[in-house]
């Protein structure tokens, strides 16, 4: 068995649903601030910033249909909660 075959067998599929499920189960919660939003054909994208151990992280997320029911919660300047990966602080989702 060659080296290529070993790595080929460890193929990982990392879908958005799996990422969200992982963060909902294992992610730590912190506060974030919405800094901007943008309407696109796919939906509303919000941009947010949060700080972990003094380091600022900026991210964006396409709002779900459920989140779109409360647009003021995601208006620029609003405080929201995010879950982040304790091993990769840049990986986060809005809660």
Protein language model annotation of sequence segments:
Residues 2-95:
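Oxidizing extracytosolic/periplasmic lumen-facing domains
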């Amino acid at each position: 068995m060659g080296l290529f075959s070993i790595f080929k067998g460890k193929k990982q599929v990392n879908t958005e649903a799996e990422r969200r499920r992982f963060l909902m189960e294992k992610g730590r919660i912190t506060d974030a601030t919405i800094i901007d939003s943008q309407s696109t054909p796919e939906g509303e994208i919000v941009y947010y910033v949060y700080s972990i151990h003094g380091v600022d992280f900026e991210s964006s997320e396409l709002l779900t249909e459920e989140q779109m029911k409360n647009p003021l919660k995601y208006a620029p300047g609003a405080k929201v909660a995010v879950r982040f990966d304790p091993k990769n602080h840049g990986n986060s989702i809005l809660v």
